[in-house]
A protein has these predicted regions:
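Active-site mouth of glycoside hydrolases
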Residues: 10-12, 18-184
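Short acidic, Pro/Gly- and aromatic-enriched capping/linker segments at domain boundaries
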Residues: 1-14
Length: 184
């Protein structure tokens, strides 16, 4: 079994990865590589490899952005309507704020986890380290308005609180959902 990347035991200016001293080099990350079903991550990872780059960062799908957020064109973190992939399965209930049905925070989306595992495996084949972001602050109200953890977007009624309180312990049910996701 491969070991995770770690600080080099003899020189903390380097990492140790695959039993070799490693410097992580990147110029970009596609935060939406997994959560955006339209994004071709295989081509992206092959492009990183061919350019001698070996690091990417991607988000879990708990946080996403709307098209045009931060004035970014073709933002991979802003999937098209109905295209967000995240850890939780879609329900049969219409009404997700960016198209499609609401999420069920008690059921996992097997397609999402298959895509995540394939992304990480492909990154490994391409020699790319993945920094996986489980949670991200909701910088603006519209971003919280897109989250599956927002009560408006799930059938469980969980997450009825202001965006600034999402990662506090204020909502025990939401905290339980977050803990379950981390364990998964």
């Amino acid at each position: 079994m491969m070991q995770p990347i770690c600080l080099h035991p003899e020189n903390p200016h380097y990492f140790l990865w695959r039993d070799r001293p490693t410097v992580l080099i990147t110029s970009t990350e596609h935060y939406g590589a997994v959560l955006n079903g339209d994004f071709d991550y295989r081509t992206y990872l092959a492009t990183l490899n061919s350019g001698g780059l070996n690091l990417t960062r991607t988000f879990s799908g708990v946080y996403c952005e709307a098209p045009g957020s931060f004035q970014i064109r073709n933002n991979t973190l802003a999937p098209a309507a109905g295209k967000l992939l995240c850890p939780w399965a879609r329900s049969e209930t219409p009404g997700y704020s960016n198209g499609g049905t609401k999420f069920d925070l008690e059921r996992w989306d097997t397609n999402y986890f298959q895509r995540l595992h394939d992304f990480i495996a492909e990154a490994g084949r391409q020699g790319v380290v993945v920094e996986f972001v489980l949670f991200c602050t909701f910088y603006e109200g519209p971003m919280w308005g897109l989250s599956p953890m927002n009560a408006a977007n799930n059938v469980n009624g969980i997450g009825d609180l202001p965006r600034e309180h999402v990662y506090t312990l204020e909502d025990a049910a939401l905290t339980a959902v977050q803990e379950a996701m981390v364990r998964k």
